[in-house]
Amino acid sequence: MENQELIKQVTEKAEKWLTPAYDAETQAEVKRMLENPDKTELIDSFYKDLEFGTGGLRGIMGAGTNRMNIYTVGAATQGLSNYLNKCFAGKKDISVVVGHDCRNNSDKFAKISADIFSANGIKVYLFDDLRPTPEVSFAIRHFGCQSGINITASHNPREYNGYKAYWDDGAQVLAPHDTAIIDEVNKVTVADIKFNGNKDLIQIIGKEVDKVYLDMVHSISIDPEVIRRQKDLSIVYTPLHGAGRVLIPDSLKEWGFENINCVPEQMVKDGNFPTVVSPNPENAEALSMAIALAKKIDADIVMASDPDADRVGMACKDDKGEWVLINGNQTCLIFLYYIIKNRIAMGKMQPNDFIVKTIVTTELIKAVADKNKIEMRDCYTGFKWIAREIRLSEGKQQYIGGGEESYGFLAEDFVRDKDAVSACSLLAEICAWAKDQGKTLYDVLMEIYVEYGFSKETTVNVVKPGKSGAEEIKAMMDNFRANPPKEIGGSAVSLIKDYKTLELTDAQGNVSKLDMPETSNVLQYFTVDLSLIHISEPTRH
């Protein structure tokens, strides 16, 4: 009975998409779903509206209210335009940057968004082709814009696309603007969307921004001399068909590296990602072609960026000469260890310097920071929180690096999102520094463990798609809260941190408050054998 009622509701909702307000292609797709005896696709496409969350939109592409298409993207852009015109009502020239990655329909969604912004009187700096997410963040700051968007679904499967919204500092939107934008987006109907653009307000940008951005990225090199000595470092790089192909090889060359070997089949822009199961640089499968090339040429390092070039995965040879993946925690550890140790060694460290990591990233980073007397801050998962720490400290302290276990790293403050362009360049410098001492990156990692303590981290992703999946994940989180484990892996739980209630509970049941800027659906269990288990609900865009 419940299912019949749901089918009735989604059918009524879908039939509204058969009106002239929607194009013929969309109407044909909706009609096909309505006529299909199996209503699974119809239900999942229309059972809810694709939520414009604090990070923007993300969803499967197709017709429907719960899909990424020109109407859901259009509503998001119209809502953001409305908010910008309210928020900056006294400003003469409101402007935004619009970028996109390699995904199917990304360029189409970007152009439609540019038209809508311009139709609302907002000047648009539109990238001429795909660009890395961090360059979009940089361009917002470079042009002094009030906002910006990037059409991307990061490393999600090929069926997905997304819409990331940024504020005037180049960071993803935070409170109070995030919820205010959501309110505006939720008010928009298809009739409200201004699709007819004003070409006089759209400025195409490209190589001139690339040059300024790459010059700034080059400025963060800590030890150019070691690169000069190791300029022939053998690097294998793959963009996994994405936006990294545009700038990462150029950045490596600008830093002075001369032996850059790109995986040719994966240098081709392709939103279907034909050479990988999923374009996620965390996965061994995604790096298999790069590692095969590395074995063939006896390379020193393998790096892969995801489709929008904000995350980077890395592999190197272990002590037996076998190629191994370096996970996000290990990469972040090496990244920040090098920044701290070598800034100190070269006399570049200042008393007000600080680093940032997320609460789910390895605690060994804190050990490195503490021993070297550098301030380290913990923040929520997501680079917008790292960007928040940078913004709060502007003019008072200097951010020198940060990262998260999900393969996102940032060594500069002129970008306010994770940056695979600068990260690949700096990781190559770290590899050159190691080789200059007769070591590998693996040797460096082992030395860090010996000095600061051994640690092993594992990430388990549980994927539950669709409406039923969202309900199942919610039930799992509710159960953990209602029935917290007394022991994990044979070790008693000594402390629980609940970031949804902002409560810390010790083994005796004493409760105290956690000092965080807002709540987040994250649970942490600390055990007596010093294990730490994080459980979190994924952010839904």
Regions found by a protein language model. Give the residues of each.
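Gly/Ser/Thr-enriched, mixed-charge loops and adjacent short helices
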Residues: 17, 21, 25, 41-45, ...
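An N-terminal, well-structured beta->alpha segment
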Residues: 7, 14-113, 203-232, 243, ...
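Glycine-rich phosphate-binding loop plus the immediately following alpha-helix
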Residues: 166-194, 329-352, 357-367, 420
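N-terminal small/polar loop signature for handling phosphorylated ligands or for N-terminal nucleophile
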Residues: 97-160, 258-313
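Phosphate-binding and adjacent anionic-ligand microenvironments
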Residues: 295, 299-301, 322-324, 342-532, ...
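Conserved phosphate/anionic-ligand binding catalytic regions in large, soluble enzymes, centered on
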Residues: 48-66, 153-156, 239-247, 307, ...
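Short "domain-exit" segments at the C-terminal end of structured domains
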Residues: 537-541
